[in-house]
């Protein structure tokens, strides 16, 4: 396959200076990193804070230049200033905070901002805007103000702005770090669809293990170096090494490892809930079969039937402390607040409701 990114012995050195400009120390934020990314791949780069992953990401878009070593994007050297324009069109970049990337007051105008600066004809700009917003599921919000969108929606608009530039790959530097779980799910699902349906190369910088588990290949960074690399199964099977450098593993991997300590026969490369359940079923065939039948019955229930069954179970047990339904958080001041209340709150005597005071929810 064609290599879209080629990194060879890349070093990026940060220099510390005192108030007078004298050098007081040096540190290799990226230290002799070599890796290749093939066209159409979904790559995840993992690492704790200070591992060098974000510094590496900024080299791919030529925001930073190597101290030594080489980095080529579509065969063009990022260290050659004559290539910067082409490289930044080939490798789009999305950052943590979508508010730092959105500059226009209307969604569609923001998405069209990049192509407009390239001198693209107006008719072509609007075609790109419509296509990009459609690919990220935000076409119905094209006339909205970004300030009225959720964090996940804003990040999808930021991704659409990059797509409108027609890049060959998108580098995303922890794009879900500031989002709630629902927003994270929206963004990651968008990235998967872009990769699988549109064949866009994705390079995802993240510290969320479940996000990395969706990638084709993972590179784990520690102290500026590549500590581990391979498929998600290969990387997360190195449980002890991951823990040693201060990183977690997917929840299913963690559970499987814990069960293994108690003598269960669990594979080292479990990374998904389905794999975990299959392995548990093999260890406890009779119990697992009954549980599977029960899950199938629950899956076939309607939403209303599930709600009624769960409510009755909660009422009978008396163990539920708090259960929320239809709770909303609205970002803009001029939007009507839906009623938000606690449906059930049981612990023998405790029963409360949520009341709204201006823009603050409080228990009363």
Question: How should these model regions be labeled?
Answer:
Residues 69-79, 87:
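Conserved ABC transporter NBD signature motif
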Residues 61:
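Helix-to-loop junction immediately C-terminal to a conserved catalytic motif
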Residues 166:
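Conserved catalytic motifs of ABC-family nucleotide-binding domains
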Residues 46-48, 358-360:
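The feature captures the beta-strand-to-loop junction immediately N-terminal to the Walker
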Residues 123-141:
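Conserved ABC ATPase "signature" region
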Residues 145-149, 153:
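Conserved ABC ATPase signature
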